[in-house]
């Protein structure tokens, strides 16, 4: 009996909570950057699940968003047009942390460059630094808009290719492996009986 196709159904069972969430995130990242490499058909049946996972990856917990987006999915089913909008907030908490850190020293270096030229006026370049510091916590919010054209940049591909690895530890404790574990003691028990027979032969 096939499962109900849409997550809004009360009998819907989503097996991809602990297994495919990192894959879905990585595929959505790659699909957003390289839409022609065949990632769209891979995520065709994941459209409903990818949107909330990306929108709620601001929170570190990956197990809670699926519980919340089950009722939300019924409303977001017609939301594939929102995908180009939703993956963006999912990418920014990852991207700005690494792209603004190299950018933050740059504004620090720019005022330092005029300092040796204007040694008698070291306080003037320091004053523009002070208003920049309170703005720095706001910078990850503001550059989100200019970061959108930066997303397709290839240097980010290793950044996102490395990020999905930490959430993957849930993959090893797959449920299909657990029913196999009792099979191994059974196979070990057979040689034990053979040993008793060997003892009898001895």
UniProtKB/Swiss-Prot annotation:
Pfam families linked: Amelogenin
Family: Belongs to the amelogenin family.
Keyword Repeat among record annotations: yes
InterPro entries: Amelogenin (IPR004116)
Protein name: Amelogenin
An example Gene Ontology biological process: enamel mineralization
Comp. bias regions, Pro residues: 78-87, 113-125, 164-176
Lineage, uppermost ranks: Eukaryota, Metazoa, Chordata, Craniata, Vertebrata
Subcellular compartments: Secreted, Extracellular space, Extracellular matrix
The organism of origin for this protein: Monodelphis domestica (Gray short-tailed opossum)
Role this protein plays: Plays a role in the biomineralization of teeth. Seems to regulate the formation of crystallites during the secretory stage of tooth enamel development. Thought to play a major role in the structural organization and mineralization of developing enamel.
Gene that specifies this protein: AMEL
Parts of the chain that traverse the membrane: none
Region called Disordered, residue ranges: 77-202
UniProt keyword annotations, A-Z: Biomineralization, Extracellular matrix, Phosphoprotein, Repeat, Secreted
Positions where Phosphoserine occurs in the chain: 16
């Amino acid at each position: 009996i096939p499962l109900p196709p849409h997550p809004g159904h009360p009998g819907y069972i989503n097996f991809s909570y602990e297994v495919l969430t990192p894959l879905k995130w990585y595929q959505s990242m790659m699909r957003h950057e390289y839409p022609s490499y065949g990632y769209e058909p891979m995520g065709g049946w994941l459209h409903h699940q990818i949107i909330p996972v990306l929108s709620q990856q601001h929170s570190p917990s990956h197990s809670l968003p699926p519980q919340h987006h089950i009722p939300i999915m019924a409303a977001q089913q017609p939301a594939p047009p929102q995908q180009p909008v939703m993956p963006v907030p999912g990418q920014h908490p990852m991207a700005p942390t690494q792209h603004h850190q190299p950018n933050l020293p740059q504004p620090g270096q720019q005022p330092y460059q005029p300092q040796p030229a204007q040694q008698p006026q070291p306080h003037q370049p320091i004053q523009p630094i002070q208003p920049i510091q309170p703005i720095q916590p706001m910078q990850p919010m503001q550059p989100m808009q200019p970061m959108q054209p930066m997303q397709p940049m290839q240097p980010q591909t290793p950044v996102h290719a490395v990020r999905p690895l930490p959430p993957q530890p849930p993959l090893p404790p797959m449920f299909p492996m657990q029913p196999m574990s009792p099979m191994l003691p059974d196979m070990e028990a057979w040689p034990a009986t053979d040993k008793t027979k060997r003892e009898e032969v001895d």
